[in-house]
Regions:
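N-terminal secretory signal peptides
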Residues: 1-14, 25-28
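C-terminal segment of N-terminal export signals and the immediately downstream linker at the start
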Residues: 34-72, 76
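Short HxH-centered metal-ligating active-site micro-motif
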Residues: 109-199, 246-249
């Protein structure tokens, strides 16, 4: 082989080596923290062993990091078919979320989560009821979830409806559960749904009151929280910003 050919081959090998090194570094940047542990290679599903080693604070940290990836446009390259196959024989979710039905606030997407990472309870205004409490108890006591997260969002239609005393079939009773948050919100200025800062203040108050209701209505969850097995936390999602604001976490 000629000397020039040898040089070309060596150059090609070196370029390929640099490309593979750079690709590995980018993968580490993209997937670091995306799996069950920060710094561990991305996996298609969380395992029981990895989930059980996490603390509630670890789980909340993973959610916060996932939202940071989402809002920065650096979401993990999810292979949903692989995730579906990996979770088909069992599930080991990290958390159970209670969030609003708003189509713009899908928890798995805005926190860059995988199939099988969370249980997701959704109802207008993210209010609890006996069925949801039972679902949360199943998620934590029987399935091993480490966090109960109640997540409201800005510009919430259910909150506006409660403020405006809207009435419509079964929705009337649901909105009645939000009205204590309306009454309990201290806010100067216009206390109508036209005032978005008031709407968002009520939404935040509603999250706080829902957390209090969960602790009072579920001795199972309250006991698990007292023992440190789980954490019950709140958050607000900003529709305009893409940021999930975790309360005191």
């Amino acid at each position: 082989m000629c000397e020039r050919c040898d040089m070309r081959e060596a150059s090609t090998i070196e370029k390929r080596r640099r490309f593979l090194t750079a690709s590995a570094a980018m993968a580490a940047m993209t997937f670091g923290g995306a799996g069950a542990f920060s710094g561990v290679a991305y996996a298609d599903a969380v395992t029981k062993a990895k989930r059980d080693k996490l603390t509630p604070d670890d789980v909340l940290s993973l959610m916060k990091k996932g939202n940071t990836r989402f809002k920065n446009g650096r979401r993990a390259d999810h292979n949903y078919l692989a995730q579906q196959r990996a979770t088909a024989s069992g599930q080991y979710p990290l958390a159970v979320l209670l969030s609003c039905i708003d189509s713009r606030a899908p928890a798995e997407t805005i926190m860059d989560l995988r199939i099988g990472d969370i249980f997701n309870c959704r109802v207008a205004g993210n209010v609890e009821n006996p069925d949801i409490l039972g679902s949360m108890e199943f998620a934590c006591k029987l399935a091993g979830a480490k966090v109960v997260l109640v997540m409201g969002h800005t510009a919430c239609g259910a909150i506006k409806g409660a403020i405006d005393n809207a009435e419509l079939g079964n929705l009337t009773g649901l909105l009645a559960k939000i009205k204590p948050a309306v009454a309990g919100t201290t806010h100067t200025g216009d206390r109508t749904s036209n005032n978005y800062s008031f709407v968002d203040a009520v939404a935040r108050k509603n999250v706080d009151m829902t957390i209090t209701s969960i602790r009072k209505a579920s001795p199972v969850l309250a006991g698990m929280e007292s023992s440190g097995a789980i954490k019950i936390a709140g958050a607000m999602y900003g529709l305009q910003t893409g940021v999930v604001d975790f309360f005191d976490v």
